[in-house]
Amino acid sequence: MYRFTLLILLFSCLSLQAQHSYTRLEAAEVANSERNIYRLSSKNSICISINGKGGKARLMINDFVHETGGNDEELEYAVFGNAKEKRAVVLLNRRAEVSLGCDMFIIDGKGGIFCGSIPVAAYTKTDKGRMDYNSILPYISIIKVSNRYVLSFETPLVVLYPFGDREEILNGRSIFYTYQNGALELNR
């Protein structure tokens, strides 16, 4: 009886926490422009443009600017939004010859916050049928529970710390990242 009461109490506490799902947003292209508009709600949107300066690609999100580290680096990104929160999470793929993970940014009406780097690549087949370190962006899902963002990976295999000293191949569902109080943290 005690365990049953404890389970009911635990379930009640979990269901009281606010949970918001962040969905992947599709861009509305602006004619004759390099800009894309992502609508968060009927009144809120973010504008993203990619252009080069000094041989480096720049991602401009409203007033927030992020410049790539290398001259040949491509910018690949995904935008996730939640209309109730009036916020967007932008994930920017870090790439050399293969994916090295992604950087996370939270964008709201006040600007952008760099949350940190997520050193995870998808270990999937390339067009040629070989296994390789590919972008994790198509396989990420994001929810927000209370004041914590949870990023999970919907792919069978991931590479943690690609090309690093601690590189390891894991089941994609066995790890997730949380962002809370200014800290991005790996959870196993």
Regions found by a protein language model. Give the residues of each.
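Mid-chain, structured segments of secreted extracytoplasmic proteins
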Residues: 66-101
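Structural motif
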Residues: 55-57, 97-105, 159-173
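Acidic, small-residue rich beta-repeat scaffolds with periodic aromatic anchors
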Residues: 3-5, 13, 17-45, 130-188
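Repeated scaffold domains used in trafficking and secretory/extracellular systems
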Residues: 72-79, 124-140
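Long, charged/polar, surface-exposed segments that mediate recognition or autoinhibition
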Residues: 87-129
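Beta-strand C-termini and the immediately following turn/loop, strongest in propeller blades
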Residues: 50-51, 91-95, 154-155
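Terminal domain-start segments
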Residues: 18-79
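Surface-exposed loop/turn elements that mediate protein-protein interactions on large endomembrane-trafficking
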Residues: 52-69, 105-122, 175-187
